[in-house]
Amino acid sequence: MPRIISRSPKMPQSRYTAGVPADGKISPGVIRVIVKTPGNQIIFTVADDTLVRQFKEILSAHFKCQMEQLVLVFMGRLLKDHDTLSQRGITDGHIIHVVIKSKHGPRSLAHSFRNLVTNNPCHQDRNPKGNSSMVCQSAGMNETKVESSLLMEPEAPKVGTESPEVGSLEHIAQVLENLCVQSLLSNMDFVHQMPPEQPYMEELIQQNPEVSHLLDNSEILCQTLELVRHLAIIQEIMQIQQPAQNPEYPPNSQPFLGLETVPNGNNHLGQSYVNNNDHMLNGVPDLLEGNCFTALLDEQVLEQVQTPSLSQPLPQEQWDQLSSSQVIYANSCGLSSITPTNATPNHTNNVSRENPAIVATQGQSNVCAVQQPAEIPVLPTISINQKPQVDKDTTITLGISDQWLEEDLQQSDDQTSSQITGGMIQLLRNHPQMAAQMLLLMNTSQLNEQWRQETPTPLQSSQLHDLLLALANPKTSQALLQIEHGLQLLATEAPALLPYIEPYLWGLGWLIPSICSYPDIVPWTWNVQDMAEPQCPESCHKSETVLQKVQPPSGDPSHSLQAPEVRFSKEMECLQAMGFVNYNANLQALIATDGDTNAAIYKLKSSQGF
């Protein structure tokens, strides 16, 4: 395929106006349209409701050509004659590209080659060797100039073109319209001989195999060469496909080219879906880290998801990298068994150990490890036998994140839930120390005393079952944090109301004895002498810290009764010195953050939009 390369000095763009008043003032309803040609650009003043056909008449009179030769392009779309400029969104200052066709109209190279026999404007070089390629020579153009303009090497731009006329767009159009050149390019034998002779063409075919199909198809080749004659349309198409690299045109808010027209567009779209699903899966364990009650399950349940044929254990390096506080909630669909590999508790060994459990599915296998204290036993074996709800040919894999999440969130089985809950209740009944530690986290003395006196009873098991189901919900922790925040504001704004809500404060560590009169507010303290020190993961300590924020300092009982202005006077001065002049906003931020200056600054910046 011949490669046409031309270089010419950049022509200065002449920009003059046509039909603009001398004073420069434009009446309403009149717009200025910039008409851009390959050589220059002109400003026309027309009415905004002008038809495209009427605008073509103005352009044809200016360029001295026929209306059928004009092609108007705006934002990558051809303007039709029956449309108006305002309907196509053309307003004052917009640019319209104009392409002027040749007078004889677009003709294919094959049609031009047929006329070559009758017109015979060139002679053929008949060599005795029987070479099938025909080299034509027209009047005023020798063979050397044709070859230099059509078969120029890639190094030619470094040297430059000798004559500015050769590099002009009009000259390129004339060369392509010449019958000798068209007959030369329509010769498929000549086209097939070009790649072996040109090294850069071979490299281009190796990098882009579609080029070889282009060389084999004569119709596509003719259409491509016909398109090369109109370089303005090619530039417009390239500007649409690369709007970020074109400073002249603003980004189009309504692109007309879909993602499927861009090379590898569907691949990028699919990769974005995969990344979104991965982020969604990675964010599921983060929702459970702040709940101290679900951490009880973290220390006992360790699930290893694998296929029935998987027998090779993971290396030690992969076990070390896995999270120690993560719970995998698997649905009953596709499960065959949940079997701990080490169900015998070891009460003598106090060293923390890893207890892997197996959850066999029909799909991809993943393994995770959870650090478990030695004195807390594992859950008993739970056998789940259920027919899968999908076909036999369907494979359920954790890699297909959207199917796994949909099945996990929407198709929970009552039988499996009851079996797991029953096993957990049985475990807590057999080990009251662990249940007491859980109640210890709740900071509740009444239930703690009731547990010591009535363990185990059927009533206690029923209450514990409901309690576990309620506390295992992540939204429960969020509700408790909201209650804690509201009580904190109430303690600072209206402490006189605290005795009236005494029955509702036991869950958050506020126990106001009935024998004490206001304002003697005494926070309840831990009282577990015969209990072992609780061992909970980091999320439990975070929840304890949050619950303890609501308690006033024990050294100064009247500290919570001070006015917020007096209590946070130093912090208020610090915020005002830093440039936060809104007194009420600073006070509310300090009340919400319990006097934490850094958190108050972050809250104020967030409210201001920074």
Curated annotation (Swiss-Prot):
CDD domains hit by this protein: UBA_PLICs
Domain of life of the native organism: Eukaryota
Matches recorded under SMART domains: UBQ
Positions in coiled-coil regions: none
Signal sequence annotation: none
Pfam family, one: ubiquitin
Residue span(s) of domain Ubiquitin-like: 31-105
Annotated ranges, domain UBA: 562-607
Protein name: Ubiquilin-like protein
Organism: Mus musculus (Mouse)
Gene from which this protein is expressed: Ubqlnl
